[in-house]
Amino acid sequence: AIQNYLMNYYLFFDSETVKRTIWQLRGKDPVTSHINTIMDYTFYWFLSVYDYYMYTGDEKFVKQLYPRMKSLMEYVLGRTDSDGMVQGMTGDWVFVDWADGYLDKKGQLAFEQVLFCKSLETMVLCARLAGEMQDARGYEKLSSSLRKKLEPAFWSEDAKALVHNRIGGKQSTSVTRYANMFAVFYDYLSEEKQQLIKQSVLLNDSILKIT
């Protein structure tokens, strides 16, 4: 849906359709699962609200939606591990991509943590727009804490990239495009490391392609 919204903004700017879809995808409270049971989709939903506001400046919609955003984030936070990170749990579908090769979905996936961090940053923005400053401070603390953990947890000097996942605190040797691409998009790494990723991952044809 988030990709469709971006095409909509570019071709039609039909914000009403985007709003209705965001509402429908969110569903009703209480939250009992991730959106479509897919953890990635929950984070994309938060990011779609961020995009919507950036394209439209529609504070009223964000204020109306904020209680549903908060309850969904409470669901996510209630399922974090001892590191404050997310992992697939019973009933979750960790999708990532329809990759042609093997894609490990176990443990702490760097890709999911990057999306989770950006979702928390989205909550900071939306809480402020909704006038919920205490919430905003709480989300800011959580996002800052998670962001500081990303490099120590997933950066590999050997690979010159973020590794795909960690299991039991141990880095895998697998490197995929997903986390590295989003970390560059969101400026989560230094310029030096972004350039390393460009060569070691983004321009490297041996890395599993995105489908």
Model-based region annotation:
Residues 1-211:
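Active-site core of glycosidic bond-cleaving carbohydrate-active enzymes
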